[in-house]
Amino acid sequence: DAEVLKELLKEKEEIQVFFDADSQVMPSCTTYNICGRIPGKHPERMILLSAHYDSYFSGFQDDNTAVALMFGIAKSLMESGYQPNNTIVFCAMAAEEWGVIDSDFDWSAGAYEQIFTAHPEWVGKVIADLNFELPALAHGTRARIRSCYEYVRYLEEFLSNLPLLTQAYPEETRITAPIETWSDDFSMAIAGIPSMVNDFT
């Protein structure tokens, strides 16, 4: 279909297309969050890396790229033999795009269930959730990290010590707060876990 559209657009600047989608809601389905960990020297303290693997359409940008990024970090850490101070937990979340029927707030259900049902004991142990969302989205010459208020000053200091990042994003590299409701870090934040995400808005 894409090739047909490309050919048609060679002849005209604008074309009209009709999209006919057949989608079905299947209630009472089970989804699974997939987690792994690299044990740290202080196993009672954890850093959570999260991304979601469910998607609308093909999901390359939202959010399979983030899952691949997260797994790449895990693979590199394991191959290096490095033992972190804090246990690092990697969690590929389900049901971020949609997971609740008959609600105005139907997204981020997998992360909500992860922290409020499956692992409420993480609260007080996870010192930070680094959530990855749409990391391949081109922002041109600017980059932002969206964070909870408590980590803004720390992250600003951290960014000031990364001159290469400033070169990569000369227009702007900054921290913005607060966390928004659009991604899984929100569920972690409302549970009391300090959270941050690459800003994609």
Q: What function would you assign to each model-found segment?
A:
Residues 1, 22, 38-39, 50-53, ...:
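Active-site-proximal beta-strand/loop segments in catalytic clefts of secreted hydrolases
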Residues 3, 44, 93-197:
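Metal-dependent peptidase/peptidase-like ectodomains
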Residues 1-61, 72-82:
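Soluble metallo-hydrolase cores and metallopeptidase-like ectodomains found primarily
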Residues 81-83, 121-122:
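Short helix-capping segments at alpha-helix termini
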